[in-house]
A protein has these predicted regions:
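Short acidic-hydrophobic, aromatic-tinged amphipathic segments that line or gate anion-handling sites
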Residues: 1-5
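Extracellular and organelle-lumenal recognition/adhesion modules and their flexible linkers in secreted
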Residues: 16
Length: 145
């Protein structure tokens, strides 16, 4: 069931619930840590998935703070669509300065450290403002390395 914030998670959990699974934890706000800690203190197993960095490669709160208090961490990596190496970043392919842009297929793709272009979304915004094709907006980082 979809929830909009961490407080709504508690509304869905029943006293007899033993395991709570939360997907896309980065979207649930700062209350996520207290909610998870409270459920764990109550004896529930809490499993949270989410992105630890945003489209610019910066820590994506509240996930880094949740990682700091987690008892067990498993970091899963995708495969870079550019070169096939392990992907540690999420590349935004659309023009937007918003931190959160809920996307469909083709808006994001997994990238490794070498192929990740954090400035790409900003270059696309600048290109749209100038009405210039996005590839002409700036250097291709992969060719510069």
């Amino acid at each position: 069931e979809v929830v909009k914030n961490a407080a709504e998670v508690l509304e869905k959990v029943q006293a007899r619930t033993e395991v709570v699974g939360i997907d896309e934890g980065q979207f649930l706000g700062d209350g996520l840590i207290d909610v998870c800690m409270g459920m764990a203190d109550a004896g529930k197993r809490v499993i949270v998935t989410g992105l630890d960095t945003d489209y610019l490669g910066r820590p994506f709160d509240p996930m880094p703070r949740l990682l700091a208090v987690a008892e067990e961490i498993t970091k899963l990596l995708a495969i870079c669509v550019q070169c096939g190496n392990p992907a540690v970043h999420t590349q935004r392919l659309v023009a937007s300065e918003d931190l959160i842009v809920v996307g469909a297929a083709g808006m994001y793709e997994p990238r490794c450290r070498r192929c990740f272009e954090p400035q790409l979304a900003h270059e696309k915004i600048a290109a749209e403002k100038k009405n210039v094709p996005a590839q002409a907006a700036g250097p291709n980082r992969k060719q510069d390395i």
